[in-house]
Amino acid sequence: YINRAFQYAYDGHNGQNRKSGEPYITHPLHVAIYLCELNFDKETIAAALLHDLIEDTDISYEDLKKEFGEEVADIVDGVTKLDKIKYSSNEEAKADAIRKMVIAMSKDIRVLILKLADRLHNIQTIEYHQDWKQEKIANETLYVYAPLAHRLGFQSIKHVLEDKSFKILHANQDKEIKDMITETNPDRDSQIESAIDIIKTLLNDNSMSAEVYGRPKHNYSIYKKIVNQGLTFNEINDLIGIRIVTDDVKNCYTILGLIHANFQPVLGRFKDFISMPKFNLYQSLHTTVLTSDGTKMEIQIRTHDMHYRACLLYTSPSPRDRG
């Protein structure tokens, strides 16, 4: 089935090339590979291979429906309709674009996921476009697709979309941040892995059930914190971040005690948003501690329900809401 979809797409795009000069089929193939890595069903993979045929060739919805069934044809048609949304540079239009895509999502969420994968590959090969086109794509990506990726739970995709867009729109600031990271904290990834191992061992030794995640703060998030909160680079406390998600509120406070007993807390950096939620109902415990080499590390502790709500709150009006 998927092989047949590939051959159909290959034939349909025959003679077409990307801006890079590569055969056009390389694009839908990359999109399909992304979705394979996410373990999507064969219909979604087939739709990924076929997703540009209606827009860029003489092949119609009815042709796809006849060859691959209504389900695949509907997904491709949904992606084609999203491509026709006109974007503007003002915030209201961007918000309206998001609402239109959410409406499309209510019919079949796979349309949006495929579109995210499509945008992920396009932003990674954007250098072949003219500068004005790169800026247009980067703006769309930063204000529409990256928040959408977050809403759908695809954090790694969100970070790539944000950082690639940020590099295009704010190249100088992006380089400054990269240089500062290299100078002050070049071993972040290994520090995070070490911290996760230590915390997991600590929780296991104390029979605490929890999931532990770690991530380096990516460049666009650093930039937002500097701009929105008026911080200097050295004042940012979560260049290394750990999130602990557990079953109930009691566990949150027990884990906090274990963290403070085994790491040195940074004075003035503990915030209890569980007992005193933010006005948008965000809840979590935030603390900043020092690793063995003196590196600051922010730790967030929350329940699964709190984590779910936090994800939904991502696009709240004020950038300060997320602390």
How would you describe each model-predicted region?
Residues 1, 10-18, 25-37, 46, ...:
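Nucleic-acid processing machinery
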Residues 5-7:
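Thiotemplate assembly-line natural product biosynthesis machinery
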Residues 41-50, 71, 75, 111, ...:
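Alpha-helical scaffolds flanking conserved acidic
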Residues 42, 56-57, 83:
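Amphipathic alpha-helical interaction segments
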Residues 51-52, 118:
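DG-centered beta-turn motif at the end of beta-strands
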Residues 53, 75, 79-84, 94, ...:
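Transcription initiation cofactors for RNA polymerase, centered on bacterial
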Residues 63, 67-78:
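Hydrophobic or amphipathic alpha-helical targeting/insertion segments
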